[in-house]
Amino acid sequence: MEVKVFRVKGVFERLGKKQPFTKEYRALKQEHVKELVYSEIGSKHRVPRTKIWIESIEEIKPEEAEDPIVRKLSLEL
């Protein structure tokens, strides 16, 4: 299986305020990315999954990645 690069956009609510986010991940499937988003944002910001809304998950080319770590890992292969 091939590892793909995904860009996730969404919003989470913390202390009554909505905070937009954009994250990039390397994963095999969209379902894995969704779980990573819930896990990372929930852990880092202490937000329950019900307060995290994922608006879009799109597969992108490794060259389009804005996160330097994701780009470097993807292009080294």
Curated annotation (Swiss-Prot):
Per its record, what are the GO molecular function terms? large ribosomal subunit rRNA binding; structural constituent of ribosome
Top-level lineage group: Archaea
Its keywords, alphabetically, are:
Ribonucleoprotein, Ribosomal protein, RNA-binding, rRNA-binding
Q: Name the Gene Ontology biological process terms.
A: translation
Pfam families associated with the record: Ribosomal_L18A
The GO cellular component terms are:
ribonucleoprotein complex; ribosome
Residue spans making up a coiled coil are none
Subunit structure, interactors included: Part of the 50S ribosomal subunit. Binds 23S rRNA.
Q: Which family does it belong to?
A: Belongs to the eukaryotic ribosomal protein eL20 family.
What name does this protein carry?
Large ribosomal subunit protein eL20
